[in-house]
UniProtKB/Swiss-Prot annotation:
A cellular-component GO term for this protein: cytoplasm
GO BP annotations, alphabetical order: chaperone cofactor-dependent protein refolding
Function of the protein: Together with the chaperonin GroEL, plays an essential role in assisting protein folding. The GroEL-GroES system forms a nano-cage that allows encapsulation of the non-native substrate proteins and provides a physical environment optimized to promote and accelerate protein folding. GroES binds to the apical surface of the GroEL ring, thereby capping the opening of the GroEL channel.
InterPro entries in alphabetical order: Chaperonin_GroES (IPR020818), Chaperonin_GroES_sf (IPR037124), Chaprnonin_Cpn10_CS (IPR018369), GroES-like_sf (IPR011032)
Taxonomic placement: Bacteria, Bacillati, Bacillota, Bacilli, Lactobacillales
GO MF terms held by the record: ATP binding; metal ion binding; protein folding chaperone; protein-folding chaperone binding; unfolded protein binding
Keyword flag Manganese: no
Keywords recorded for this protein, A-Z: Chaperone, Cytoplasm
Protein name as annotated: Co-chaperonin GroES
Species per Swiss-Prot/TrEMBL record: Streptococcus gordonii (strain Challis / ATCC 35105 / BCRC 15272 / CH1 / DL1 / V288)
Subunit structure: Heptamer of 7 subunits arranged in a ring. Interacts with the chaperonin GroEL.
Any matching Pfam family: Cpn10
Highest taxon in the source lineage: Bacteria
Length: 93
């Protein structure tokens, strides 16, 4: 399992398929945002005074993330997206 550092967050993207004229199009290929589930969260970042600022998200949260943000990584058979917390736009409730 991936353990993110600092303010980084590991996400599992929810893939949606869309059919147009019999062709399957990746659902997120043209969207500005993606929906994802938080898998793991780093400890946060430190301020200039050394105070630790904890992340706003936690494992299990469903979030909205910028479409082209982060780095795709593989862990075994699973593919995850590793992003900075700043790339997460909202928690979906």
């Amino acid at each position: 399992m991936l353990k993110p550092l600092g303010d980084r967050v590991v996400l599992k993207i929810e893939e949606k398929e869309e059919k147009v004229g019999g062709f399957v199009i990746a659902g997120n290929s043209h969207a500005a945002t993606k929906t994802a589930t938080v898998v793991a969260v780093g400890q946060g970042v430190r301020t200039l005074t050394g105070e630790l600022v904890a992340p706003s998200v936690k494992a299990g949260d469903k979030v909205l993330v910028e479409s082209h943000a982060g780095v795709e990584v593989k862990d075994g058979e699973e593919t995850y997206l590793l992003v900075s917390e700043a790339n997460i736009l909202a928690i979906v409730e």
